Amino acid sequence: MKREAAITAFLAGAALSIFAAEPGQNADWKAVKQSNGVVIYSRPHGGSNLKEFKAVGEIDATAETVHKVIDDVEGYTSFMPYTAECRVIERKRDSILTYQRVSPKIVSDRDYTLRIRQESWPVENGLAYLDRWEPANEHGPAAKPGVFRVTVCEGSWLLEPAGEGKTRATYSVFTDSGIGGPAFLANTISTTGINKLFAAVRKQAKNPKYQTK
C-alpha cells in the first residue's frame, strides 16, 4: 500500500481527460474522502479500471502565490516528496516542457516528460490560473534502463481567489504508474497521495520567496 501512495504522490506533484468542473455539474463525480479540508472525488475513466480523481481544497495564500509554487518546477526536488530529478527542457510564455523522475525507493524509479499549458484570466479579487498537462515523452530524454517510463499522466490545477489571502484549489488527475495489483487498491491509495500533494503545496506557499510583493 505504501508503494502505491508514494507513486501517486509523485505523479500528483509534477502533475487530461481532465475537467475542472464543479462536482455538481457532472453526475459521474462521487465524493470518496474528506480530510484536512480537502474533498476528493472520483469517477470512472473509459477503457480503464483506474479512476480519475479530483480534489478541492482551500489554501491560505493568494492564487498568485500558489501559482508561483506550482510554477516552480525547478524547485520540486526540494519540496515535492520523493522527487529525485526535475528539470525544465523548455519554458515559453504559456507552456513548460519538463522532465521528471520520481524515486519512491520501494519500487523502481518512474519518469516522464510533460507539457504543461498555462492560462489565466481576470475574476473577482484577482486572477484565476489554470495549468493543464499531458505526456510529451517524445520531446524528452530517452527511456533509461531500470526506470519505468510513465505514458499516462494527465492532469490540471485550477486556482481561484477565495477571499482575502485565500485560494480555492482544484486538482484533477488521471495516471497509470504501472504498479501491479488490484485496481480498487490503487484507486483507494491514490487519495493518500493527493492529500500529501495538498500538504506540500500549502507548506511551500508559506515560503516568503513566493509571496506577492
Language-model segment annotations:
Residues 21-213:
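Eukaryotic helix-grip
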Residues 12-20:
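Hydrophobic h-region of N-terminal signal peptides that target proteins for export
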Residues 1-10:
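Bacterial N-terminal signal peptides that target proteins for export
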